[in-house]
Each structure stands twice: as structure tokens, then as C-alpha cells.
């Protein structure tokens, strides 16, 4: 083991001097044993001359002093992988943070791994049912694909992710890995306790590097979660789900570290390596011929500006986008998915079939027509519309309300039982509304229900 000494500390960045000829390699993990016996992990980022390296700390550097001894492990950060991590909560370096003792796995993986080889990739396109009407109908997720949940602050990204974890664990009994990247610790705590209550925790591994942690941890924790998911894909040939909340914080942490590492900032103050860092992470999230990693990533949009470099870079990697809209949330329609702004690569008649494709296009068409008529309604009122347009508006408002749905994870807030709606039920419901089969029902009957039969039942009580 090579030993060095701390020469300078600037916030989360620590410079370490090593004897000549013993410099650690880039991305090697170093560790310091603090006076209280705890270990602090550093990751080598730059070589400054022949004897000094610049590193980024994975935990707070409070209490470190110059001259402390630093040990080079000779390899990158290694995290435990395998079925033993299911039901556990880990930090960025793979240490348990749930107070349930050590995680004893037979294997460890480096958090920095190569993307699968080109010939190993699978190109099969198939839909992945989530049980959430608006997603399954209008922007279907693909198995082994990447989906982005875009939204500003407080429109429901985390609730939607929690619902997806719940539905997938219960309906499809798949394994999930959740990486909490730079989000609120309270939300992570809520998620953990809700998972324990619902029993979903047994099929999920949780990895957290939250807002209160230094940028090194927030920049690397998504990679930790990804390595755990890759093990299930490559060694156990499973289809795994990887949830990242929030991918924007991954970029944000990179930009915090970048200036301290002496790099020139690029557009809007982001790091010049933004596209490379994002590419290295996203390229590993893929399907091979053995198994798949399907990822759902929440993407915070700063100031609701989709052209900001961070969300814009993430866009390029996605197969489907679910855009959450504040204007829809203000109508009380949850999930607040914007049906006209959200897209999916696999909404194609060759993949999902003609029936699904045509219904989705009809829904989008009627909602777009309603949107076009809204200016006229605002100025002249409903009475000035032709009979045909009045019918379009009436059906569009029913469609809009039918796109809402009660969630299992929100039962405590809504007082309504959660609903999982199968794809054929979803298609059937929207086809009937558009065909005018339910023109006589009040629009409130369609709000926060599951299937069309429930809407008909609800109408009887109104």
C-alpha cells in the first residue's frame, strides 16, 4: 500500500503528496483514517506534477488537517453487488446507512465500468406496461430504454417515480435499484419507510447521496446504483429497473467540482465536460442479449427552461420523455403529464400495433384542437363555438380528466384507492370517449378513476 500526505484542502477537493514514482492512477480510490477511526474515501481526479494528485472527497472534509496520512487502494471505488444488497440502503462507497449491519456480498464491482460491447447489445423494441394510463397510451416506455421525467419544482416527479416502483415490484415482481442523487433527505426517508410498509423493499436496492452531501458523493452515487443494476443484468440475466432521482443533480455536482479542479466553465457556468460525463453514465444504461436495464430518470428543469444545457444534454439520450406541466397540475389533474409535449420512440404502429397507435393519435388530435380553441373560448365564450366544436371541447375535457388516475402511493393524500390499469382497458376507455359513447356523462365522472367502467359507476353517484 502506498501512503501519501495531505498537502492542501479546499472544500471537497483535497491535494495529496506521494513519494516520487508512487502516484495513484486517475480514478483510484484513496482513503484517510480519521482520528475517530472512520474512513473517508477520496477519488483521484488529476495529476499535478510528479508528486501531487488532486482528489475529490466522497464525504465531508471537516476535521481533516494537512499532513494526515492517505492510503492508496490501487483500484477504483468498489461497491458490493448481488442479491444481498436487496432491501438495503447504501451510500456512494457501498457502506450501509440503514443501521442493519454490514452488507456481506461475494462480489464487488467498480463504479467505473465500460459500456457493453456493440455486438452484445439487444435491438429488440418492446413496450413496458406501467399501469399508468397517460404513460401507457401516449408515451409508452420501452423495455431496456431510457425515460426522462421532466418537470420544475413541485409538479410530482418523485411521486410518479414512487408509483412506478410500486407498480413494477407488485405487478411484475422485478428488481429495482433506486439512486437518490442530490435530492431531499426527507423524501428518501419517506420512500424507504413506504417501501418497508408495502413490502416492496425486499426487491429494491437503495443508494443515496443527498443534498446535504459533498459534490463528490452526488457526482458518483448514480454510478454506484448503475453498477448494482449491471450485476443483475450481466450475471443473473435479469430485467432490472434503475430509478435516478434526480439526474440534474448529477450534472450540478459535476459543475461544483469542475471549478475547484481548475477547469474553465462553459455555457451557463456548467463544466466543459458536461456532455462526456452524461454520455459515460447513459451509455452503460442499456439492454444486452442477456438482460436489460430500463431506467426512469427524474430531470429537474431549472426555472422551467428546457433549453438549459443540463436538461438539453439529457434529452439526447432518451427513448421517451414524460413532461410534467405546472399548468396541468394547477387544474388538479395528477399525474400532471403534458400529453402533447411528452414523446416516445416506440409509439409506432409496427411496435405497439395499429389500435394503440390510432387511439393515441386521436387523443392527441382532440386535445390539440381543444388547445387551439381555448383562445376563442377565453375571448368570446363557449356560446360562439359551432356545435361541432362544442362537442370537441366536451370530449376533450373528458379525455383530459380521464388521463388522471389515483395513485397507490398517494392514497394518504387523496383518500382514494390506487389503480393499476391494464393497457387494453386504457385503450378501450379512450376509444369509447372519443367515439362519443359517453357524451351524456358529466365530465367529473372521469376524474381520478381507473377504468371507463369506474367512470360510468361514478356518474351514477353524481
Curated annotation (Swiss-Prot):
Annotated ATP binding sites: 151-158
PANTHER family registered for this protein in UniProt: ATP SYNTHASE, ATP SYNTHASE SUBUNIT BETA, MITOCHONDRIAL
Catalyzed reaction equations: ATP + H2O + 4 H(+)(in) = ADP + phosphate + 5 H(+)(out)
Official protein name in the record: ATP synthase subunit beta
Role description: Produces ATP from ADP in the presence of a proton gradient across the membrane. The catalytic sites are hosted primarily by the beta subunits.
CDD domains: ATP-synt_F1_beta_C (cd18110), ATP-synt_F1_beta_N (cd18115), F1-ATPase_beta_CD (cd01133)
GO molecular function annotation: ATP binding; ATP hydrolysis activity; proton-transporting ATP synthase activity, rotational mechanism
Membrane topology: Peripheral membrane protein
Oligomeric form and interacting partners: F-type ATPases have 2 components, CF(1) - the catalytic core - and CF(0) - the membrane proton channel. CF(1) has five subunits: alpha(3), beta(3), gamma(1), delta(1), epsilon(1). CF(0) has four main subunits: a(1), b(1), b'(1) and c(9-12).
Organism phylogeny: Bacteria, Pseudomonadati, Chlorobiota, Chlorobiia, Chlorobiales
Disulfide partners: none
UniProt xrefs under InterPro entries: AAA+_ATPase, ATP-synt_VA_C, ATP_synth_F1_bsu, ATPase_a/bsu_AS, ATPase_alpha/beta_chains, ATPase_F1/V1/A1_a/bsu_N, ATPase_F1/V1/A1_a/bsu_N_sf, ATPase_F1/V1/A1_a/bsu_nucl-bd
A Pfam family it matches: ATP-synt_ab_N
Compartment(s): Cell inner membrane
Gene assigned in the entry: atpD
Family: Belongs to the ATPase alpha/beta chains family.
